């Protein structure tokens, strides 16, 4: 029997949120009742984030304000535990390339060991976003490249400000 309220989480660092992320979030919002954009806040992560978790959540909230069933929320535990806490039935992830699939396949196996009741759903990136990574956006912005077609306007402005400091 399917749950009455179909909730999913879409996890990521979103440092910063890109139009590729927003494509996946928007598509998930059309398929599910509630989409929680789970913004990772993990102090032991190898790569430090450029923006604090609160600002990354705000970027997502601003970019998805037109989607009534989407909200951003920070998390700092296992994604399957966060999914359980929020009542999510599935974890939704975007896949860009074969390398994403290999990584996500391994993560899916670990997640299923921890929480077999939580499904993993994968949405393929469209060609327009198949190359897009937050790290690439930051690198482009660092060297003065044009990022206006890669991130929401508020994010582009804030990223340029942050990198000029």
Where are these regions (language model features)?
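Nucleotidyltransferase catalytic core that binds NTPs
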Residues: 1-165
């Amino acid at each position: 029997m399917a749950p009455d309220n179909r909730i999913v989480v879409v996890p990521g660092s979103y440092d910063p949120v890109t139009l590729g992320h927003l494509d996946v979030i928007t598509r998930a919002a059309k398929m599910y009742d509630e989409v929680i954009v789970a913004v990772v806040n993990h102090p032991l992560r190898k790569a430090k984030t450029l923006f604090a978790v609160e600002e990354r959540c705000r970027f997502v909230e601003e970019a998805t304000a037109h989607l009534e069933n989407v909200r951003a929320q920070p998390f700092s535990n296992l994604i399957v535990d966060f999914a359980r806490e929020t009542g999510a039935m599935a974890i939704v992830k975007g896949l860009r390339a074969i390398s994403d699939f290999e990584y996500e396949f391994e993560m899916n196996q670990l997640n299923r060991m921890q929480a077999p009741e939580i499904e993993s759903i994968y949405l393929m990136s469209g060609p327009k976003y198949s190359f897009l990574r937050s790290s690439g956006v930051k690198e482009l912005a660092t060297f003065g490249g044009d990022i206006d077609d890669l991130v929401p306007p508020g994010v582009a402005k804030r990223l340029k400000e942050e990198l000029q400091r």
